[in-house]
Amino acid sequence: IEIKSTGKFAGYVGLNKLKDDLPPSPCIEIGWRLLKCHWGFGYATEAGKRALKYAFNILHLNEVVAFTTLKNKKSIAVMHRLGMIDVHKNFMHPNIDLSSSLCEHVLYKITKNMWEIFQEE
């Protein structure tokens, strides 16, 4: 993500084929990371919409997932703004210590059909 007015790097949004060691696999994940100074400006949502458009219209995917720790309310809010739904299949991330409060993750998804309907609203 590049800020148009300044040309500065703000972060990234992308699609990723998940490794087999993660519970939602096999699937394609949408993910984002922004520098903290760029949080709250809608950049993740704007770029996420473009990534989903690419996923469904160019790559012809049928479904895209996203996940984050339960504590990451900002990312969960982005998932909602993208039209994604909580599939109620939380999982313990295998690469995070089980004793960590960041281990439990929530799983969201959006299908191509859901995305098309969301675009009409």
Which ranges hold each PLM region?
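Acyl-donor (CoA/ACP) binding surface of acyl/acetyltransferases
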Residues: 2-121
